[in-house]
């Protein structure tokens, strides 16, 4: 499984209230959530980004409240992956559970800039910065995590397993 898109780089401690402001938590409709992803941090993000683009962030991405709305909004907006130096553990689990690929890759975060064209091979953990001609590495997902992501999340994965 691969992803390719432009990078959108943000800093450390991007919390779930910044990813999807609390005033929109009265809905769980992914399309509506996507309209407001990162709007308090980068009001133009939803207009500038294209499907497949990649969020790059610093330490502790997804900290704060435990809400599935945050990774759901990111995925619904068309973001293909998030690369960060580190993730809040609850965000990490929620992202996998809804099928949003996320990678911890501190070196990549240091080198990637907004606008760089990035390609990720999730099976190897290889991150290519096509703009700079550089290659970075992250730990690839274990096979069972890849199965969950490919299925579109834990619920879809479980449905498929139960249908067998």
Curated annotation (Swiss-Prot):
Keywords: Amino-acid biosynthesis, Branched-chain amino acid biosynthesis, Leucine biosynthesis, Lyase. GO terms for biological process: L-leucine biosynthetic process. It holds the Pfam family Aconitase_C. Its EC number is 4.2.1.33. Disulfide bonds: none annotated. Pathway: Amino-acid biosynthesis; L-leucine biosynthesis; L-leucine from 3-methyl-2-oxobutanoate: step 2/4. It is an enzyme of class 4 (lyase). It catalyses: (2R,3S)-3-isopropylmalate = (2S)-2-isopropylmalate. It comes from the Archaea. NCBIfam families: leud, LEUD_arch. PANTHER family: 3-ISOPROPYLMALATE DEHYDRATASE SMALL SUBUNIT 1, 3-ISOPROPYLMALATE DEHYDRATASE SMALL SUBUNIT 2-RELATED-RELATED. Catalyzes the isomerization between 2-isopropylmalate and 3-isopropylmalate, via the formation of 2-isopropylmaleate. Heterodimer of LeuC and LeuD. This is 3-isopropylmalate dehydratase small subunit 1. It comes from Pyrococcus furiosus (strain ATCC 43587 / DSM 3638 / JCM 8422 / Vc1).
